[in-house]
Curated annotation (Swiss-Prot):
<dbReference type="InterPro" id="IPR036852">
    <property type="entry name" value="Peptidase_S8/S53_dom_sf"/>
</dbReference>
<dbReference type="Pfam" id="PF00082">
    <property type="entry name" value="Peptidase_S8"/>
</dbReference>
<feature type="domain" description="Peptidase S8">
    <location>
        <begin position="1"/>
        <end position="321"/>
    </location>
</feature>
<dbReference type="GO" id="GO:0016020">
    <property type="term" value="C:membrane"/>
</dbReference>
<feature type="active site" description="Charge relay system">
    <location>
        <position position="105"/>
    </location>
</feature>
<dbReference type="InterPro" id="IPR000209">
    <property type="entry name" value="Peptidase_S8/S53_dom"/>
</dbReference>
<feature type="active site" description="Charge relay system">
    <location>
        <position position="35"/>
    </location>
</feature>
<feature type="transmembrane region" description="Helical">
    <location>
        <begin position="261"/>
        <end position="283"/>
    </location>
</feature>
<protein>
    <recommendedName>
        <fullName>Subtilisin-like protease het-Q2</fullName>
        <ecNumber>3.4.21.-</ecNumber>
    </recommendedName>
</protein>
<keyword id="KW-1133">Transmembrane helix</keyword>
<dbReference type="InterPro" id="IPR015500">
    <property type="entry name" value="Peptidase_S8_subtilisin-rel"/>
</dbReference>
<keyword id="KW-0812">Transmembrane</keyword>
<comment type="function">
    <text>Serine protease involved in heterokaryon incompatibility, a process that ensures that during spontaneous vegetative cell fusion, only compatible cells from the same colony survive (non-self-recognition). In P.anserina, the het-q locus exists as 2 incompatible alleles, het-Q1 (AC B2AXJ5) and het-Q2 (this entry). Prevents cell fusion with strains containing the gasdermin-like protein het-Q1 by mediating proteolytic cleavage and maturation of het-Q1 during the allorecognition process, thereby triggering cell death.</text>
</comment>
<dbReference type="InterPro" id="IPR050131">
    <property type="entry name" value="Peptidase_S8_subtilisin-like"/>
</dbReference>
<feature type="compositionally biased region" description="Pro residues">
    <location>
        <begin position="83"/>
        <end position="96"/>
    </location>
</feature>
<feature type="active site" description="Charge relay system">
    <location>
        <position position="266"/>
    </location>
</feature>
<comment type="similarity">
    <text>Belongs to the peptidase S8 family.</text>
</comment>
């Protein structure tokens, strides 16, 4: 078994545990995963999200304490591969047996977000059957467009698109372009994977165009270099990168369950989606009301719902590396923060929060 990537995600998880102070009265970030569906029968989803892995192969999940089962955070599901139209209202949460995933791609992506973004709610749109490799990476654009419009009715804040298009006639992409612009008008952030065609190929669309999505490349666990399969940096798009090599994700129950290793920009994308969700969760939490009111008088915090605004924040959290690629910081706002000596935890907590809001103010006001 290849070495499991743990460095980046360990930094992210420890930062969340130490710096975010969520309460159940805080607004909840809602994320749409539009992919191959979701395997609700996987036993791990009946437990709280994984805190860490143990065992001889480091693949035995140890759940977080005092958190709800992951399945309760799946709030809606619709199969766009079937002819039945989706409802335009939020209904009851889906039952595990009612959700389908034949490939495991969507389950892996949703599982990463459930693990990395505590309390975030998910809505799942199945937009590809997952039995054909070409359809998996580039499903019917009109189907994805319909799923985006459904996600808008589900009041999501972020959409994960681990898919993309190459050499597609513009006419075929027009419905999807329109849906992406509609999502922007609804202050919904869209993240898309750039693809894994290597440095001789450009990024897939919409990741290649900053007008439609925030593009994400895969990089190594240290965040120091893009993966060998990463396509070349886009001239007109964001070139964020996050760990996408040897990530441990849920394996379909029908294939034995448990976990397996995957690599690619498809899986780096939900890592960055989780970071964006954590940024929103931090800003919205009750603990930050005073800072939110103060900073909100100086800058437009609503810009966090725009591609440009969130893009600037993600740049502020990370650093430019390896040419035009930009590594997203797994320590969130606190990469350059100097820890106190622990003698006055309450004071240090306030100072850490003040530091974070300083970073945020500078990024949004740019």
């Amino acid at each position: 078994m290849s070495a499991i990537s743990h460095h980046s995600l360990s930094h992210l998880n420890s930062t969340v545990s130490k710096r975010l102070m969520p309460t159940y009265s805080d607004p909840v970030v809602r994320i749409a995963v539009l992919d191959t569906g979701f395997d609700g029968s996987h036993p791990d989803f009946s437990h709280p999200r994984t805190a860490y892995f143990t065992g001889p192969f480091s693949d035995l999940p140890q759940p977080e304490k005092d958190e709800e089962p992951q399945l309760t955070r799946i709030k809606a599901y619709h199969d766009f591969c079937q002819p039945s139209p989706p409802g335009d209202r939020q209904g009851p949460p889906p039952q595990p047996h009612s959700m389908v995933d034949l490939a495991g791609h969507g389950t892996a992506i949703a599982g990463l977000i459930l693990r990395l973004a505590p309390r975030a709610e998910l809505v799942i749109g199945r937009v590809c059957h997952g039995v054909d490799s070409n359809e998996l990476s580039a499903p019917d654009p009109s189907r994805v467009a319909a799923a985006i419009r459904w996600a808008i009715t589900q009041k999501v804040h972020i959409i994960n698109l681990s898919l993309g298009y190459r050499n597609q006639p513009l006419k075929e992409l027009l419905p999807l372009r329109a849906a992406l612009l509609e999502a922007q008008r609804s202050n919904i952030l869209v993240f898309a994977s750039t693809s894994n065609q290597g440095s001789h190929e450009p990024a897939a669309w919409p990741a290649s165009d900053a007008r439609f999505a925030i593009g994400v490349h895969s990089c190594n666990d240290m965040g120091s270099a893009p993966s060998g399969s990463s396509c070349k940096a886009s001239e007109n798009g964001y070139n964020f990168m996050a760990v996408g090599e040897n990530l441990l994700v849920h394996r379909l129950a029908q294939k034995g369950g448990g976990f397996e290793l995957v690599s690619g920009s498809s899986f780096a994308t939900p890592v960055v989606v989780s970071v964006a969700a954590l940024v929103l969760a931090f800003v919205w939490q009750e603990e930050c009301k005073r800072e939110r009111d103060e900073v909100g008088r100086e800058v437009m915090l609503e810009d966090l719902g725009s591609l440009g605004g969130m893009g600037r924040v993600l740049m502020a959290l990370g650093e430019k590396t390896a040419g035009s690629y930009w590594a997203v910081g797994m320590k969130l706002f606190w990469a350059g923060y100097r820890e106190g000596d622990g003698r006055d935890p309450e004071k240090e907590e306030k100072e850490a929060r003040r530091w974070a809001w300083g970073v945020l103010r500078g990024a949004v006001a740019y």
